[in-house]
Amino acid sequence: MCIRDRYYTWNEIIKNDICDAMKAYGHEVKLLSYEIKSYIKDIEFLNIVENELNNGRNCGKPYDFIFSCNFMPVISKIALRNKIPYVSWTYDSPCMTMYSEMIYNPYNFMFHFDSSEVERIRKSGVKHIYHLPLAVNVRRTDAQIRACADNVSPALINKGVAFMGNLYNNEPDFVESVAGLPDYEKGYINGIKLAQLTMPGSELLEEMFDDALCDRLKKYVSFSKEEEFFVKDTDMILNMLKKNISSMERIGILRELSEVCDVTLYTQSSGCDMRGVRVREYIDYERDMPVMFANSAINLNVTLRNIRTGIPLRALDIMGAGGFLLTNYCPELNEYMTEGKDFVSYIDAGDCCEKAVYYIEHEAERKKIAANGHDRILDMFTYEHQIKKMFDVIRKEL
């Protein structure tokens, strides 16, 4: 029996890879691309989806699932109204829609790449929430890399360190954006941010930023939230501060690296000129990114602070392309792979610089680690592997 999926896409970068894996798993996949006006309530979108669901039932080809990347409350409501399972795979953090009361919908089957988020949501009483790391379409990336092996663009070749990502330098600084914030609170928060930078493996920010501090800040700042969202103001402030810290961390590491080796930054961020850092435009995720990772000596990952335990997609992309990964400490990466064998992690900026220089100079060791990382992705983190795990879980629950 053919399983029919209605896949809502917002043109996320992993759309095609997920579709290919679902089809390989024997599913018939029909995409729906639509610009949702509100992730909470969109009558036009609801009517479009429900008409298609009804048409499928009327012609004897009902849909078995609705699917989306990231959890969408408006889709969950459609699933509840039509009593059809809604499968979501969240790969963003923070994903604020996971604070919607619709996470309690019994027709949801929610998968999340970060086990700490799964635990948080499960503790709130949600049953159908599961941990599922992200994936790489290794078949596609390997073919792309082989196809252009003899004709790689110079813009995709790096003999030193390459970093592809957002610097978040255009995000508002929380402390400076709050009008009238007293100097004491400014100094306290800035002190926490600086202390967190010097203690990369800790959760100092969350330990020191308590509800009492948040209550004091409420005198100067307020947040607009949907009624059905139960996110605390403390969590919203923490998410903003974590982005600020991530920006400081990424810029700081790139600056220190530029003093000891060649550094190339691929980014959409504006106003990020740094002495010694070659800045290039963001490159296409499917076409150019795997080729760049495969042709860079060192590929740097600096995880966004909002990700507590999960393996960032970028880290998997690097290893899946056969690139050498140098990353900050990532709990789940260490659960699935071996540090120093499949990838290399650093403790702080100084350690990052030392290891970057070492592995630039020791090509054989670097290539061996990169090859091991690629093999681990092939063994455990392909889309075919993860999609099978996803629907094996769902089959047991239905």
Language model regions located:
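N-terminal beta-loop-helix "entrance" segment that forms/cooperates
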Residues: 37-53
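A conserved, positively charged/aromatic
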Residues: 99-111
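Nucleotide-sugar donor-binding catalytic core of glycosyltransferases
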Residues: 8-15, 127-128, 133-307, 330-333
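Short N-terminal targeting/anchoring amphipathic segment
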Residues: 7, 52-71
